[in-house]
């Protein structure tokens, strides 16, 4: 399925993953039993650094005062590359994983690397989850179409994914690089399933630009370099609500591409009880409210959507179906497309 290499010509990866939160020693203690949860838990995640720093760290520290939670943060593909290397070396440092590519969890489960755990909070989850507890969605991101309302009237903005192939948008549209972005990778797979690979041939012919990530796209939407773009809903909601920027979301009539980001525990963890408690926290109302404060959607049905977004249940009902098994089995081919 190597029809072209155009996505490989995108901007080089600039942002480096960094380790955030406490350093501390390498040894991880198990649960201290009667004394409560203790030791350390290492989480590898693609969730945004500001959410970790401003919401996760203080709330998790309050919930687990005797347990140290460390966070390794990077883009989904960067985190996957790191953990894949550790798996090959048989030195998995992570206790838990949170990245925006459910298909990768299927691979990990097939390799029998995950510790099944059905959280008591899982009954409230309306998003996707493994019935055996290998992984459970913890946040929802949506790939949508965005535009600058200072440059484009709402009635003139693209209303469907197919409209992006219209010649009137030639050279004025963009998308994130699926080689670097897990959500963009999922969007490529979902839209190829819906419209065929010819859809991306048409986008290429229409001069679509492939950017390093969502931040570069939103900046160029603001300057007017792009008229419209595939981008994460959360980026646009944050700018519109916190900085009063004129960026708007056009929710495609042919469905958003919904990307649940699961959490899973590696069966190599030295602190399984601590890792399970962290899963419980993320799936709790408190943890999910932190997700929504980061402008993403909660996986729970009883937590409202972020400001300016439709209710999550409505988006779930109309979202494009994603074949996670197909994505897992055809990872290299999809990225080379």
Per-region residue spans from a language model:
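C-terminal capping/gating helix-and-loop segments adjacent to ligand/active sites or protein-protein/ligand interfaces
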Residues: 289-337
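Periplasmic-binding protein-like
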Residues: 52, 141, 171-179, 202-203, 210-211, 245-267, 281-302, ...
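Short, low-complexity disordered leader/linker segments with a strong preference
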Residues: 1-40
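A bilobed periplasmic-binding-protein/Venus flytrap-type ligand-binding module shared by bacterial periplasmic
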Residues: 146-151, 189, 259-272, 282, ...
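A ligand-binding cleft/hinge motif common to bilobed small-molecule-binding domains
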Residues: 103-107, 227-246
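Short, polar/charged alpha-helical segment
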Residues: 37, 42-70, 78, 145, ...
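Extracytoplasmic ligand-binding site segments that recognize negatively charged/polar headgroups
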Residues: 45-54, 72, 76-77, 92-226
């Amino acid at each position: 399925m190597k029809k072209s290499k155009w996505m490989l010509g995108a901007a080089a990866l600039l942002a480096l993953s960094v380790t955030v939160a406490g350093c501390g020693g390498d040894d991880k203690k198990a649960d201290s039993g009667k004394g409560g949860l203790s030791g350390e838990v290492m989480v590898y995640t693609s969730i945004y650094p500001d959410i970790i720093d401003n919401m996760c760290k203080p709330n998790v520290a309050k919930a687990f005062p005797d347990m140290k939670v460390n966070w390794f943060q990077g883009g989904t593909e960067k985190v996957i590359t790191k953990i894949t290397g550790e798996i090959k070396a048989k030195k998995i440092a992570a206790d838990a994983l949170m990245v925006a590519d459910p298909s990768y969890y299927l691979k990990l489960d097939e390799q029998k690397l995950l510790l099944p755990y059905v959280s008591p909070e899982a009954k409230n989850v309306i998003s996707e989850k493994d019935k055996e507890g290998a992984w459970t969605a913890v946040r929802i991101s949506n790939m949508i179409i965005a535009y600058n309302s200072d440059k484009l009237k709402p009635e003139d903005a693209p209303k469907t994914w197919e409209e992006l192939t219209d010649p009137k948008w030639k050279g004025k549209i963009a998308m994130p690089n699926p080689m670097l972005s897990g959500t963009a990778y999922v969007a490529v797979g979902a839209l190829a399933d819906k419209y065929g690979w010819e859809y991306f041939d048409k986008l290429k012919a229409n001069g679509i630009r492939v950017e390093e990530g969502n931040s570069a796209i939103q900046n160029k939407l603001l300057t007017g370099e792009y008229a419209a773009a595939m981008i994460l809903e959360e980026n646009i909601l944050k700018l519109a609500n916190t900085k009063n920027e004129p960026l708007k979301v056009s929710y495609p009539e042919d469905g958003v591409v919904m990307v649940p980001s699961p959490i899973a525990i590696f069966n190599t963890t030295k602190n399984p009880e601590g890792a399970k408690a962290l899963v419980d926290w993320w799936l709790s109302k408190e943890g999910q409210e932190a997700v929504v404060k980061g402008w993403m959607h909660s996986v729970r049905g009883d937590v409202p959507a972020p400001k300016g977004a439709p209710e999550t249940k409505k988006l779930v009902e109309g979202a494009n179906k994603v074949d996670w098994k197909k994505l897992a089995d055809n990872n290299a081919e999809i990225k080379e497309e």
